């Protein structure tokens, strides 16, 4: 044990002694009640589990979330999480034990106390502050310390997340009978990330162990791929860095998905409830899903999606006017708009409105060489036609800035997701008729995307 980790643990020992003076165990031990929220049970089930983390700062990133409101964070996480992790280390993560009861009161899930635990006192303190589980790191503890600390946790009906980061610690975790093992993809000695650690260590943990992959997970593609090795994921920094936390969680759990061609407020709500991030409003008069500004306002009133206006060879002033009055998050160009058009549009649009460009894919991939284009939509050229192009063209391509469109529905969305684009763009495949979305089809698509 050395460098960053050694320094943190040395400082933690000093903190523990000071806290014992300030808040002696005898002053609160009689008030401690056993946990009634079962951490081990919460991570069981057919679907991949998610431990979502409340984290203000870290040694590798500094302050991650300025506007850190644990109650608000927990109120969002409760819709997605199997358990919620709370950083309580003060010096390096700007955490606090005071965050634990706030989160516990704001969400029904088991609460994990994430700290560098080296003393039974910390576990009693965590339970007093309403934690239902604690992290024990084999990089910090010897076997005797681990046995003592896990026994204290279990005596309080708390769960233990046992963290490992190499083969030696994996062997120890097995010998110690750890039920839930977290594989930390971050090397706590130099803070580097290697997702291969999960791939290498998980298969050797054996049956009956719940495997959680920790650190460095920030995309839906990573989650889908690593879900073959892990039963769940602990995710913090990738979520905390985003202002729109709800969208950030959806982006990782489901992908960056859009439902296009919305014409009714109830359909916007159904899309949002199902798990979409973006809602598409089509301002192309020839489309059967075209809407006016008034209709668009009505759609937007239905749900807090990020709305994208779809245009085709439109007058730039018209695009900007609609973007302004409807507070659009992005404008999507579906015509023959060239670089000069995009340049002029970028100059005229507010900076916070993105520009997306739809590209038709037939026999070969088009170049993504526009300046000032934030995302591309790959379609078969006839938006809303329900036809797909040959997805094998996308193999081996970097697709972080691409949404895949064309003929997407419940029967092919998983295959589409595995292509590796940032997200999927649904339209006719979730409709009962053009412009009328089917809430059951929407729910089915997103449940299918989450079934891993």
Curated annotation (Swiss-Prot):
Give GO MF terms, alphabetically: indole-3-glycerol-phosphate synthase activity; phosphoribosylanthranilate isomerase activity
Keywords from the named record: Amino-acid biosynthesis, Aromatic amino acid biosynthesis, Decarboxylase, Isomerase, Lyase, Multifunctional enzyme, Tryptophan biosynthesis
Q: Which domain of life is it from?
A: Bacteria
Query: Looking at the record, which segments are called N-(5'-phosphoribosyl)anthranilate isomerase?
Result: 257-452
Its Gene Ontology biological processes? L-tryptophan biosynthetic process
Pathways involved: Amino-acid biosynthesis; L-tryptophan biosynthesis; L-tryptophan from chorismate: step 3/5; Amino-acid biosynthesis; L-tryptophan biosynthesis; L-tryptophan from chorismate: step 4/5
Entry's EC annotation: 4.1.1.48, 5.3.1.24
Which reactions appear under catalytic activity for this entry? N-(5-phospho-beta-D-ribosyl)anthranilate = 1-(2-carboxyphenylamino)-1-deoxy-D-ribulose 5-phosphate; 1-(2-carboxyphenylamino)-1-deoxy-D-ribulose 5-phosphate + H(+) = (1S,2R)-1-C-(indol-3-yl)glycerol 3-phosphate + CO2 + H2O
- State the HAMAP family in the record: IGPS_B, PRAI
Complex and partners: Monomer.
- What NCBIfam families does its record include? PRK00278.2-4, PRK09427.1
Name under which the protein is recorded: Tryptophan biosynthesis protein TrpCF
Q: Which organism is it from?
A: Salmonella typhi
Q: Which taxonomic lineage does the organism of this UniProt entry have?
A: Bacteria, Pseudomonadati, Pseudomonadota, Gammaproteobacteria, Enterobacterales
């Amino acid at each position: 044990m050395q460098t960053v980790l050694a320094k943190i643990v040395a400082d933690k020992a000093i903190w523990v002694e000071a806290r014992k003076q300030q808040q002696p165990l005898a002053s609160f031990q009689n008030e401690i009640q056993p946990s009634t929220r079962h951490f081990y049970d919460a991570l069981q089930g057919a679907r991949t589990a998610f431990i979502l983390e409340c984290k203000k700062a870290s040694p590798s990133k500094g302050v991650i979330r300025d506007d850190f409101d644990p109650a608000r964070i927990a109120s969002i996480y409760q819709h997605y999480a199997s358990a919620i992790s709370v950083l309580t280390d003060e010096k390096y993560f700007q955490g606090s034990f005071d965050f634990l009861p706030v989160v516990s009161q704001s969400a029904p899930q088991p609460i994990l106390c994430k700290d560098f635990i080296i003393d039974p006192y910390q576990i009693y303190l965590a339970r007093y502050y309403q934690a239902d589980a604690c992290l024990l790191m084999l990089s910090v503890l010897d076997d005797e310390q681990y046995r003592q600390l896990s026994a204290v946790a279990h005596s309080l009906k708390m769960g233990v997340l046992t963290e490992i980061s190499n083969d030696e610690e994996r062997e120890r975790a097995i010998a110690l009978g750890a039920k839930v093992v977290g594989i930390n993809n971050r090397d706590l000695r130099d803070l580097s990330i290697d997702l291969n650690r999960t791939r290498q260590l998980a298969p050797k943990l054996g049956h009956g162990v719940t495997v959680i992959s920790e650190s460095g997970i920030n995309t839906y593609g990573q989650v889908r791929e690593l879900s073959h090795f892990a039963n769940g994921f602990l995710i913090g920094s990738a979520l905390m860095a985003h202002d729109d936390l709800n969208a950030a969680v959806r982006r990782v759990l489901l992908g960056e998905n859009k439902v296009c061609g919305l014409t009714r407020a109830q359909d916007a709500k159904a899309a949002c409830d199902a798990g979409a991030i973006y809602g598409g409003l089509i301002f192309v008069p020839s489309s059967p899903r075209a809407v006016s500004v008034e209709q668009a306002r009505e759609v937007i009133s239905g749900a807090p999606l990020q709305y994208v206006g779809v245009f085709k060879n439109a007058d730039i002033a018209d695009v900007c006017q609609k973007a302004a009055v409807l507070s659009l998050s992005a404008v999507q160009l579906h015509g023959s708009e060239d670089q000069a058009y995009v340049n002029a549009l970028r100059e005229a649009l507010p900076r916070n409105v993105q520009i997306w460009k739809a590209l038709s894919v037939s026999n070969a991939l088009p170049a993504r060489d526009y300046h000032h284009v934030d995302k591309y939509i790959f379609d078969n050229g006839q938006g809303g036609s329900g036809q797909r192009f040959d997805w094998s063209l996308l193999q081996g391509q970097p697709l972080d800035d691409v949404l895949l469109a064309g003929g997407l529905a419940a029967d092919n969305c998983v295959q589409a997701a595995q292509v590796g684009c940032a997200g999927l763009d649904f339209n006719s495949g979730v409709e009962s008729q053009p412009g009328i979305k089917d809430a059951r089809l929407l729910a089915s698509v997103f449940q299918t995307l989450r079934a891993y």
